[in-house]
Amino acid sequence: MSAKSKQYFNIFVFIISLIFFDQLSKYLVAKYVKLGSIYFSFFDDFFRIIHVRNTGILFSMGSNIHYSLKKIFFLAMPIFILIFVFYLSLKERNCIARISLLLIFSGGVGNVIDRLFRPSGVVDFLDLKFYGIFGLDRWPTFNFADSYVVIGMILFLVYDFFIKRKVLNK
């Protein structure tokens, strides 16, 4: 196997592993945790597993818009963006930047799969106490795909602000 083929194989395995873990966790929550109920909590209610559905996007924004507009804004547009992010990840030479883009891509695909095959909404289940920060008692419930996107964005910002700029300023 050539170095390029091995690199693409590793990217494929990374993406499939992340999407599989996300979809498996959502499947298990949807199957075994009653909608709206708390399955269990840890550390004095700091972390909970709770089954909710999100028909909107980030923090349930857009939940009330018309179904056909949702298909355009929450399905078609993200698919085009994901294709672009995947293309960028293949072109990127820096390992941190590539991993960050692949995390964003994998998380986006995980949630697009839910939008395609779960008409009742994306399965969210990770729930954290937020102690009144930003006026929130609890952070909006999320899933592993959401985590991949956020971690990928943070990694990319770190890369852009600290690594890429340092290289460009030399």
Curated annotation (Swiss-Prot):
It holds the Pfam family Peptidase_A8. The gene is lspA. It is found in: Cell inner membrane. One of its GO terms (biological process) is proteolysis. The active site is at 124, 146. The chain crosses the membrane at residues 9-29, 72-92, 94-114, 143-163. It is an enzyme of class 3 (hydrolase). GO terms for molecular function: aspartic-type endopeptidase activity. Keywords: Aspartyl protease, Cell inner membrane, Cell membrane, Hydrolase, Membrane, Protease, Transmembrane, Transmembrane helix. Pathway: Protein modification; lipoprotein biosynthesis (signal peptide cleavage). The keyword Transmembrane applies. Belongs to the peptidase A8 family. PROSITE patterns: SPASE_II. Its EC number is 3.4.23.36. It comes from the Bacteria. One of its GO terms (cellular component) is plasma membrane. It catalyses: Release of signal peptides from bacterial membrane prolipoproteins. Hydrolyzes -Xaa-Yaa-Zaa-|-(S,diacylglyceryl)Cys-, in which Xaa is hydrophobic (preferably Leu), and Yaa (Ala or Ser) and Zaa (Gly or Ala) have small, neutral side chains. This protein specifically catalyzes the removal of signal peptides from prolipoproteins. It is a multi-pass membrane protein. The keyword Hydrolase applies. It comes from Borreliella burgdorferi (strain ATCC 35210 / DSM 4680 / CIP 102532 / B31). This is Lipoprotein signal peptidase. Signal peptide: none annotated.
